[in-house]
């Protein structure tokens, strides 16, 4: 009689899990929770329960693989539900900002990290993002000049977006690694 696959083996064999943890540093990959969202309802599905503070999503419709601290999970849940309702990017951003201001969802803590990967050659392949709510370039000594084009050439440096707002964050392109240089491993 053939043996049924154990849930752990089925999880390990799911290619979405390997894809989802791709942007993470090696020491965070094995313990990351992996979730996916139903496109029509926004409902969360846990593909693998993790043991650390990181949660990842396989490639979404926008082409990005994302990982983030679990403190951001309610924000991602809300985003998934709004996208299932066919809300525009601006409507999603505005709703999340309003919910954060109202205290319905928590703002990320200063220094909270997120990780993003894309295999689209018109996007930065490997990008780490540090949340710095309400910070300004003067407070941190960081540029606000986008390094996107330089990062696409493998020469990007960090820059701040949305300075002085609760959504302020520093974009950190990761250059000269096998993954950022186009290797899929």
Which sequence ranges carry the predicted segments?
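Primary mode marks residue(s) on the alpha4-beta5-alpha5 output face of response regulator receiver
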Residues: 11-185
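Sec/Tat signal peptide C-region and signal peptidase I cleavage site
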Residues: 4-11
């Amino acid at each position: 009689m053939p043996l049924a696959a154990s849930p752990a083996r089925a999880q390990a064999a799911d290619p979405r899990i390997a894809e989802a943890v791709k942007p993470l540093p090696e020491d965070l990959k094995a313990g990351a929770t992996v979730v996916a969202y139903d496109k029509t309802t926004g409902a969360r599905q846990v593909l693998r329960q993790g043991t650390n503070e990181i949660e990842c999503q396989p490639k979404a419709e926008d082409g990005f693989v994302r990982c983030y601290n679990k403190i951001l999970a309610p924000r991602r849940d809300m985003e998934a539900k709004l996208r299932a309702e066919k809300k525009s990017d601006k409507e999603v951003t505005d709703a999340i900002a309003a919910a954060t201001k109202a205290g319905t969802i928590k703002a990320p803590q200063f220094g909270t990290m997120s990780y993003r990967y894309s295999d689209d050659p018109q996007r930065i392949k490997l990008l780490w993002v540090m949340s710095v709510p309400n910070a300004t370039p003067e407070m941190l000594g960081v540029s606000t000049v986008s390094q996107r084009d330089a990062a696409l050439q493998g020469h990007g440096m960090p820059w701040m977006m949305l300075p002085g707002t609760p959504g302020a964050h520093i974009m950190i392109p990761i250059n000269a690694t096998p993954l950022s240089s186009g290797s899929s491993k």
